[in-house]
């Protein structure tokens, strides 16, 4: 066949005839089988030439037969036409014959369909593909134009015809002949005819014809057809999809594509969802490196597929469909929409995976969004998709997400929207999402950890069973990791998942059960959560299912309760009580039979009762364990998790036990030999000898001490006894039982509010010094027990509405304040004292007394730590602080080696002052409800007299001392709950509980609940704040008489000032809470701001947030006139800053904030607040930072301080201060200097260099600003000549280098294109900077002479920056053809005072290098490549050179 082709290429007509004769046998075979269907010649040139070339036409439905190879046929026909005697007229006759032949639709159809090839020919070719007759004829150049013309003439008659019975559309079949032609003779004409056909074709054929264009036209016609399609796109938007699909396959001009892209972008919001995949594909494929960011940003803005999902769901749920058919079509439409969205993101994922430019553009488009309002759910989806594409993108996405989360740009509602809308898209990348969540969990920022937990939550909610299993497994891994923040958050997520989908969680219960092996390292609150999770899974099982989890939990709890190791016993108590609560509230029983339901409920009550009895029997011999059991049981009742009938059984038992153990009649005289006279003290009622009750505290406590001492070496008695150490916790359980049973009414036990206690006179007076150590410890322990009793009494009765009870509660509050003073007196003289425990849990376990053997071993093996307390003297409170370790319980007689007080100070007279904050672990916790007492008014001593004690109907009001007592506790609670956990260092389990000691009850309340309670307290707190404000205003009033001023003692002023500060701290903690950024908390924020706004003027309801913030800011700023201390002023500033964070336009108030900060700096404060006070220095740093951060002109502010305040300080006496800035002294100068240098560097670093295209005015403004910055820098550097201490020099080295680097990056480009027009200004700027760099050079030499490594380690980097500056200045001068302005000179090294530094190495002077006068080692003459930088080793080597020289630019 190859030889035959070569012969055809070289021979003439005779050879053609010979070849035709060779094919005759095949033709004869064909005639024998198909003779009846063969078309007769009838003298037609068309038929004759076809037959001569090897093709036989057939009639009817029979295919035309091709007897030779297609290429041979085309060549034979071509040569037959060219060598025909009538050429070129024969072409016209041939085409006319074809036209006549195809007038019959069947014949035309045959010509458009592929030819039949004979078997022998197929075998020889090895292919089964055969072209149609028309396709073969189009491959002959001399026939192509005429045949194309004929085809386009025939197409219109088939445009509006439907498909044939065999599914063939003739119009499509005709156009298909034009596809993939080897050569197009007249492409321009073909393009014109195609476009003309498209313009008249029906819509369905228009789509097909348009999409066929790339397969029909050659590359030379792409520009023309693109232009015409662009015009058609404008005219007919229904053709957008096929036209854009074609554009992706055409070679078009980028500018043209840019116009089309803009046109499409404008219509993107109005297109149908099914068109999105093609449109997005076009947009992504048409981007270039330069336009990618712009295109992606615009696409992100306009691509909103969410509107196609949510409205359809809402509409489907709200509309009433009239028939099932409509409902079915609606469902199909929703499924179709989801499929289209998946296709859209498949296109995007494909582009991101294979086009790095697109991936980076998406990343940058999301990165540059700065506000939460501008972010969309699409941003979250795209970040997750980018994260899943490759390992190279993961770090970048993690960093960006962290920044967005920390700036509150991406919040929970956005993530929820992303998952609920695009869960089908995200489901495919579930492993990557879980990997990202795991990574975020390892952060130290609680907000980032929370975001990771949300990823787990939504993955579990929206994804399939396999992914749910992976989520639970990952969360269990976090729980067992040992990192407190991870553990807490993972447990919270598991609790949420149980609420979200309990049935799915039950399938994964086996994973969760493995956490039981890690209980030893958990905190009490974590243990509660674990048992809550497992109990919920265990007791929510459907009837008939396996209860293996219940069995495992019962085994674990019984094992821990029976343990002789106290830590495990505590775990068992917590777990048992938690499980009892879940069992009691479980209601998942079938309701088929009321009798069966009653039986099951009775069985549940029996289980709960037996479990509680087990706990009680295991704890009754240990005061520690009993106290924890009572507190845990009380929490269970407080959370309303106990069934009424169970509560009834418990309540009566508790009431009887308490009464028998602690309450005696008033007339019953205490029996025993006590070291002090026993009296009934702190009673609020006058009892006769016949009635009344008393708390039998001293006799019971003293009896316990004696018993402990007598059985120090014996086994613990099995006889049941109630310890006085359980008094407070037992009472808490009692009052919660009574309150629950009587709907909060405590009349049944109201006698405990005012009853006295059997005590000695606790006030030591002058006899304190003469007391023995044993007596001191005994008295101190009784004071602690009394103090904690009153705290629980206030907890119990604080919400009673009776005026009489309210008055008694306030009286108890006064008793608490009095007892605080007594405690401080005792603790000051008993340094090694350890108080009796107040509450027991694992957090405080390490701080409690141990047995003597345990303490001795601990002291031998472990150094003493400030946080851990050892066993104290048996004569102290620890005589009854018995701890069951192993199988013995004894009182340790050996004193601990260290005092509990970590922060103590000794006065000049040798008296030790103690802070009770260090003893927080030994105080009973105040409930959040106690602060409702703040609703009582504040009465100062100006008004307070004894009348209110004599008036029976007058409500006792709150005094300053009692107010301070409450505010201190509230402030600590809010700091612990509302302060962002990322601000607290996340520690390991060894110290995990320290910051939470004393807040165990608080942590069982939600943060939102705490915030809601505080918002309710805003009105009384504002009342107190205004009263204190008026108090200090009156003190400063000139018309106040001397007698009135004398009445306001220093102690009262101090107390009022402390109240002022605590109120501001509480308000700041509230409004700085990050939870307000969540959408669900906005209503709470509005409520809080409305309270403040209404204090200024009565506001209408539902005011916009911005107005509320503005009014609240105005209200609070009015208090700055009366702040009594610098610290109060700082908290006021912080509070105002917290309010500004809630504003959308904070800049309007920033200048006012700066003004307030400046007033604090310019005010003379009491002497004790400034001299060498570290706390004051920290506060001063913060206030100065706030001033410079919020002022509108930082450079001007720095110039004012350095130009006015510092000269006043320099000329003032040694201990004096600046008159303009009284806070600026010689001791605080370093703080001012450091903050000013840092803010100056930050300011210039933020300046934009600009471009040469900027206006001349912009260039002049930037030059002026840089002149001010360099002048400030010069003033600051020159101050180190006067104040040359290490901190000042260190700041100069550190921030001097940073300033030079900022000048290089931000200012030098500006000087490049400003030099020609502003030559003198630029040179003046450089000359000023040269003086500064020379000072820095001298500072480097001075540091080397002082041989202070803290300073010299900064020298190499500073010198490197200075050298780069010299070279950069020279490059700028060369660029502007001003080389003569740069010269090299030699300058000897000098110190800060200008004295020459004598070289220690005479030989080094012969080989020294030339330095710039900026103090930079420069080898410009040696063409040294300074742009590449130098390593520190070379810089340090240069530091050893004795002589250095200078380059200067002028």
Swiss-Prot record:
PTM summary: Monoubiquitinated on Lys-559 during S phase and upon genotoxic stress by FANCL in complex with E2 ligases UBE2T or UBE2W. Deubiquitinated by USP1 as cells enter G2/M, or once DNA repair is completed. Monoubiquitination requires the joint intervention of the FANC core complex, including FANCA, FANCB, FANCC, FANCE, FANCF, FANCG, and FANCM, and proteins involved in cell cycle checkpoints and DNA repair, including RPA1, ATR, CHEK1 and BRCA1, and is mediated by FANCL/PHF9. Monoubiquitination prevents DNA release from the FANCI-FANCD2 complex.
Protein location: Nucleus
GO molecular function: DNA polymerase binding
KO phenotype (gene knockout): Mice display delayed pre- and postnatal development, defects in germ-cell development, and increase incidence of microphthalmia and tumors of epithelial cell origin.
Any Pfam family the entry gives: FancD2
Start-end of Basic residues biased regions: 859-869
Cross-referenced InterPro entries: FANCD2 (IPR029448)
UniProt biased composition (Basic and acidic residues): 8-21
Keyword set, alphabetical order: Cell cycle, Developmental protein, DNA damage, DNA repair, Isopeptide bond, Nucleus, Phosphoprotein, Ubl conjugation
GO biological process: brain morphogenesis; cellular response to oxidative stress; DNA damage response; DNA repair; gamete generation; homologous chromosome pairing at meiosis; neuronal stem cell population maintenance; regulation of CD40 signaling pathway
Annotated stretches, region: Disordered: 1-37, 853-879, 1398-1450
Residue segments, region Interaction with BRCA2: 246-357
Acidic residues: bias regions: 1441-1450
Modified residues (Phosphoserine): 220, 714, 1255, 1404, 1412, 1434
Cross-link Glycyl lysine isopeptide (Lys-Gly) (interchain with G-Cter in ubiquitin): residue positions: 559
GO cellular component: condensed chromosome; cytosol; DNA repair complex; nuclear body; nucleolus; nucleus
Top-rank taxon: Eukaryota
UniProt modified residues of type Phosphothreonine: 1426
Annotated region described as Interaction with FANCE, given as residue ranges: 1-289
Family matches, as PANTHER family: FANCONI ANEMIA GROUP D2 PROTEIN
The protein's assembly and partners: Homodimer; cannot be ubiquitinated and does not bind DNA. Part of a FANCI-FANCD2 heterodimeric complex that binds and scans dsDNA for DNA damage. Interacts directly with FANCE and FANCI. Interacts with USP1 and MEN1. The ubiquitinated form specifically interacts with BRCA1 and BLM. Both the nonubiquitinated and the monoubiquitinated forms interact with BRCA2; this interaction is mediated by phosphorylated FANCG and the complex also includes XCCR3. The ubiquitinated form specifically interacts with MTMR15/FAN1 (via UBZ-type zinc finger), leading to recruit MTMR15/FAN1 to sites of DNA damage.
Function: Required for maintenance of chromosomal stability. Promotes accurate and efficient pairing of homologs during meiosis. Involved in the repair of DNA double-strand breaks, both by homologous recombination and single-strand annealing. The FANCI-FANCD2 complex binds and scans double-stranded DNA (dsDNA) for DNA damage; this complex stalls at DNA junctions between double-stranded DNA and single-stranded DNA. May participate in S phase and G2 phase checkpoint activation upon DNA damage.
Entry similarity comment: Belongs to the Fanconi anemia protein FANCD2 family.
Name used for this protein in its record: Fanconi anemia group D2 protein homolog
Protein species of origin: Mus musculus
Lineage of source species: Eukaryota, Metazoa, Chordata, Craniata, Vertebrata
């Amino acid at each position: 066949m190859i030889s035959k082709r070569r012969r055809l290429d070289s021979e003439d007509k005779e050879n053609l005839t010979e070849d035709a004769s060779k094919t005759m046998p095949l033709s004869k075979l064909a005639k024998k089988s198909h003779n009846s269907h063969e078309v007769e010649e009838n003298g037609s040139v068309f038929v004759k030439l076809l037959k001569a070339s090897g093709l036989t036409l057939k009639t009817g439905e029979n295919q035309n037969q091709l007897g030779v190879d297609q290429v041979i046929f085309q060549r034979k026909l071509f040569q037959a036409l060219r060598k025909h005697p009538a050429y070129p007229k024969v072409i016209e006759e041939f085409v006319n014959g074809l036209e006549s032949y195809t007038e019959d639709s069947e014949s035309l159809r045959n010509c458009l369909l592929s030819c039949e090839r004979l078997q022998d020919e197929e075998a020889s070719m090895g292919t089964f593909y055969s072209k149609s007759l028309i396709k073969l004829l189009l491959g002959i150049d001399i026939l192509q134009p005429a045949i194309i013309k004929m085809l386009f003439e025939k197409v219109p008659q088939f445009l509006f015809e439907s498909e044939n019975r065999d599914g063939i559309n003739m119009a499509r079949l005709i156009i298909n002949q034009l596809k993939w032609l080897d050569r197009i003779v007249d492409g321009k004409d073909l393009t014109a005819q195609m476009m003309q056909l498209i313009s008249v074709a029906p819509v369905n054929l228009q789509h097909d014809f348009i999409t066929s264009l790339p397969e029909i036209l050659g590359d030379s016609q792409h520009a023309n057809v693109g232009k015409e399609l662009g015009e058609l796109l404008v005219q007919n938007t229904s053709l957008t999809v096929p036209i854009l699909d074609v554009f992706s396959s055409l070679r078009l001009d980028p500018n043209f594509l840019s116009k089309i892209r803009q046109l499409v972008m404008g219509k993107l919001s109005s297109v149908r969802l099914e068109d999105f995949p093609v449109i997005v594909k076009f947009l992504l494929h048409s981007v270039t490196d330069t336009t990618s960011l712009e295109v992606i940003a615009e696409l992100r803005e306009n691509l909103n597929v969410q509107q196609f999902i949510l409205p359809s769901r809402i509409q489907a749920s709200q509309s009433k469909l009239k028939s099932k058919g409509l409902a079915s079509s609606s469902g199909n439409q929703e499924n179709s929409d989801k499929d289209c969205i998946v296709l859209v993101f498949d296109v995007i994922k494909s582009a991101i995976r294979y086009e790095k430019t697109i991936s980076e553009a998406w990343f940058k488009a999301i990165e540059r969004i700065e506000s939460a309002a501008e972010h969309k759910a699409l941003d979250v989806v795209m970040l997750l998709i980018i994260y899943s594409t490759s390992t190279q993108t993961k770090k970048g996405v993690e960093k960006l997400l962290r920044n967005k989360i920390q700036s509150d740009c991406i919040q929970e509602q956005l993530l929820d929207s992303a998952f609920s809308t695009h869960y089908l898209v995200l489901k495919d990348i579930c492993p990557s999402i879980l990997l990202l969540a795991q990574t975020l969990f390892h952060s130290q920022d609680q907000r980032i950890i929370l975001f990771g937990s949300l990823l787990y939550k939504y993955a579990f909610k929206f994804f399939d069973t396999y992914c749910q299993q992976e989520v639970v497994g990952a969360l269990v891994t976090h729980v067992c990791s040992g990192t407190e923040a991870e553990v807490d958050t993972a447990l919270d997520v598991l609790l949420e998942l149980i609420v979200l989908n309990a049935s799915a969680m039950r399938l994964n219960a086996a994973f969760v059960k493995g956490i039981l092996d890690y209980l030893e390292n958990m905190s009490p609150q974590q243990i509660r959560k674990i048992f809550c999770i497992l109990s919920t899974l265990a007791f929510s099982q459907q009837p008939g299912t396996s209860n293996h989890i219940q069995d495992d939990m019962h085994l674990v709890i019984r094992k821990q309760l029976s343990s002789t190791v106290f830590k495990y016993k505590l775990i068992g108590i917590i777990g048992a009580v938690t499980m009892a609560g879940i069992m009691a509230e479980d209601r998942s029983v079938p309701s088929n039979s009321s009798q069966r339901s009653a039986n099951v409920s009775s069985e549940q009550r029996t289980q709960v009762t037996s479990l509680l009895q087990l706990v009680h029997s295991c704890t009754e011999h240990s005061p520690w364990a009993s106290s924890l059991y009572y507190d845990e049981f009380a929490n269970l009742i407080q959370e309303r998790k106990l069934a009424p009938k169970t509560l009834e059984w418990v309540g009566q038992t508790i009431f009887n036990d308490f009464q028998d153990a602690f309450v005696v009649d008033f007339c019953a005289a205490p029996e025993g030999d006590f070291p002090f006279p026993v009296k009934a003290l702190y009673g609020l009622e006058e009892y006769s000898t016949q009635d009344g009750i008393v708390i039998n505290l001293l006799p019971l406590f003293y009896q316990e001490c004696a018993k402990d001492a007598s059985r120090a070496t014996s086994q613990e008695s099995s006889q049941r006894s109630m310890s006085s150490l359980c008094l407070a916790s037992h009472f808490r359980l009692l009052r919660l039982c009574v309150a629950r049973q009587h709907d909060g009414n405590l009349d049944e036990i109201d006698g405990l509010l005012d009853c006295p206690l059997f005590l000695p006179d606790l006030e030591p007076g002058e006899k304190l010094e003469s007391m023995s150590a044993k007596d001191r410890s005994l008295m101190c322990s009784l004071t602690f027990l009394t103090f904690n009793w009153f705290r629980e009494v206030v907890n119990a009765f604080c919400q009673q509405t009776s005026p009489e009870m309210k008055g008694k509660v306030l009286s108890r509050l006064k008793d608490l304040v009095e007892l605080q003073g007594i405690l401080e007196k005792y603790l000051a003289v008993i340094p090694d004292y350890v108080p009796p425990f107040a509450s027991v849990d694992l957090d405080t376990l390490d701080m409690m007394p141990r047995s003597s053997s345990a303490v001795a071993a601990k002291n031998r093996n472990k150094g003493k730590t400030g946080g851990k307390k050892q066993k104290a003297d048996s004569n102290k409170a620890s005589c009854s602080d018995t701890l069951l370790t192993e199988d013995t319980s004894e009182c340790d007689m050996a004193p601990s080696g260290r005092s509990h007080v970590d922060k103590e100070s000794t006065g000049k007279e040798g008296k030790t002052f103690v802070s009770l904050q260090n003893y927080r672990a030994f105080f009973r916790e105040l409930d959040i409800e106690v602060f409702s007492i703040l609703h009582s008014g504040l009465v100062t001593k100006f008004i307070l007299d004894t009348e209110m004690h004599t008036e029976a109907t007058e409500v006792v009001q709150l005094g300053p001392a009692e107010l301070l007592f409450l505010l201190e506790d509230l402030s600590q609670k809010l700091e612990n709950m509302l302060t962002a956990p990322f601000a607290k260092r996340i520690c390991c389990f060894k110290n995990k509980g320290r910051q939470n000691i004393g807040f165990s009850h608080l942590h069982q309340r939600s943060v939102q609940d705490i915030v809601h309670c505080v918002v309710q307290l805003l009105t009384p707190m504002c009342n107190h704040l205004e009263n204190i404000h008026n108090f200090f205003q009156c003190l400063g009033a000139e018309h106040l008489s001397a007698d009135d001023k004398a009445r306001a003692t220093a102690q009262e002023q101090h107390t009022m000032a402390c109240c002022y500060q605590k109120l501001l701290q509480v308000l700041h903690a509230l409004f700085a809470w990050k939870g307000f950024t969540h959408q669900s908390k906005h209503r709470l924020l509005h409520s809080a701001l409305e309270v403040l706004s209404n204090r200024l003027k009565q506001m209408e309801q539902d005011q916009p947030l911005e107005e509320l913030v503005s009014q609240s800011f105005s209200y609070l700023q009015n208090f700055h006139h009366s702040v009594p201390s610098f610290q109060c002023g700082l908290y006021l500033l912080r509070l105002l800053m917290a309010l500004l964070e809630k504003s959308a336009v904070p800049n309007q108030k920033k200048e006012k904030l700066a003004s307030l900060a400046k007033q604090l700096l310019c005010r003379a404060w009491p002497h004790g607040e400034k001299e060498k006070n570290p706390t004051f220095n920290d506060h001063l740093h913060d206030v100065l930072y706030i001033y410079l951060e919020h002022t509108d002109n930082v450079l001007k502010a720095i110039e004012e301080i350095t130009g006015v305040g510092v000269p006043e300080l320099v000329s003032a006496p040694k201990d004096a201060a600046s008159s303009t800035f009284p806070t600026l002294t010689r001791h605080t100068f370093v703080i001012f200097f450091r903050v000013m240098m840092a803010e100056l560097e930050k300011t210039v670093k933020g300046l934009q260099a600009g471009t040469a295209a900027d206006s001349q005015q912009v260039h002049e403004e930037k030059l002026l600003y840089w002149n001010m910055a360099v002048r400030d820098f010069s003033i600051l550097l020159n101050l180190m000549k006067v104040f040359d201490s290490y901190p000042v020099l260190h700041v100069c080295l550190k921030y001097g280098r940073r300033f030079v680097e900022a000048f290089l990056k931000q200012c030098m480009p500006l000087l490049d294109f400003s030099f020609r027009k502003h030559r003198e200004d630029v040179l003046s700027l450089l000359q000023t900077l040269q003086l500064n760099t020379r000072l820095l050079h001298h500072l480097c030499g001075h540091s080397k002479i002082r041989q202070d490594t803290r300073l010299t380690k900064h020298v190499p980097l500073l010198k490197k920056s200075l050298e780069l500056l010299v070279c950069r200045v020279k490059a700028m001068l060369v660029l502007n053809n001003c080389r003569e302005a740069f010269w090299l000179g030699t300058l000897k090294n000098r110190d800060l005072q200008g004295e020459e530094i004598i070289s220690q190495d005479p030989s080094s002077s012969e080989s020294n290098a030339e330095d710039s006068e900026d103090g930079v080692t420069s080898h410009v003459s040696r063409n040294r490549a300074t742009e590449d930088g130098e390593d520190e080793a070379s810089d340090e080597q240069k530091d050893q050179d004795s002589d250095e020289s200078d380059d200067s630019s002028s």
